[in-house]
Design a protein with these regions (language model features):
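FIC/Doc superfamily catalytic core
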Residues: 1-175, 179-243
Length: 243
């Protein structure tokens, strides 16, 4: 699949610059799909149409108030990812706190959790709070290692999965850590030049994958789902820029 992605990127490189209206359309589609996929994995039942309504200022009927709040939080995170990636800012520890702030609304300097945490739907006991400084140092080392990874290599998608899995393993804040893991994974790939993507999976399928990750500490193929989403977005861009 990576070989096909490379071919698509070369094809699109021969078609730039895109007309402004097409560039905006691609970004809108990318944003909507990214928000939708993440909401599905958070247990939301919002449709793409309802998400679009929220982003246009209309609150759908018969939805919990938390749903439109999360849509706006994810939109803010997406737009900030775009801004930072265009500036070439590398994934770093400060970014973890910043994106946690965007998706939860808590202060960006909020300390790591200070209580023990049992995540029942993943059957997982997170590291003790006293272990968090060491665990976050491991995440920092992973970010530094990620800087040297070739964007057009399988290692890039393995690294994306490693970043996701490490944030999940550590659970630094005790709330929305799965979403935070996916945001950091998305940003890593964006900074490498890819579209923003989140796995197109059912919530149960994703949870089962996370359970395997936490039990084995091994990669479980999440990178393949990310490649699939990237390829679908690139195919759309090729289709709509064909002469």
């Amino acid at each position: 699949m990576l070989r096909t992605i490379k071919k698509r990127i070369i094809m699109l490189g021969n078609r730039v610059p895109f007309a402004p209206e097409k560039q905006k359309y691609f970004e809108d589609v990318e944003r909507l799909q990214w928000i939708y996929n993440n909401l599905v994995l958070e247990g939301s039942s919002l449709t793409k149409h309802q998400i679009q309504d929220v982003m246009e200022g209309t609150i759908p009927q018969n939805v919990a108030i938390e749903e439109p709040i999360m849509v706006e939080a994810l939109r803010s995170a997406f737009d900030e990812m775009y801004f930072l990636a265009e500036k070439g800012v590398k994934p770093c520890m400060e970014m973890v706190g910043y994106f946690n702030h965007l998706i939860t609304g808590y202060d960006r300097d909020i300390p790591y959790r200070k209580t023990s945490l049992m995540v029942h739907h993943w059957d997982y006991v997170a590291p003790h709070p006293a272990e968090l400084p060491e665990k976050m140092t491991e995440l920092d080392s992973l970010f530094k290692e990620a800087e040297g990874v070739d964007a057009m290599s399988e290692a890039c998608f393995e690294m994306a999965e490693k970043i996701h899995n490490k944030v999940i393993e550590v659970m630094p804040y005790g709330e929305k850590d799965g979403l935070l893991a996916r945001v950091m994974t998305s940003y890593f790939l964006m900074e490498k030049g890819y579209p923003a993507v989140a796995p197109d999976m059912k919530e149960q399928e994703y949870n089962e994958t996370v359970i395997k990750v936490l039990k084995t500490r091994e990669l479980q193929g999440l990178g393949e789902f990310l490649k699939k989403e990237i390829l679908e977005h690139l195919d759309l861009m090729i289709q709509l820029t064909a002469h």
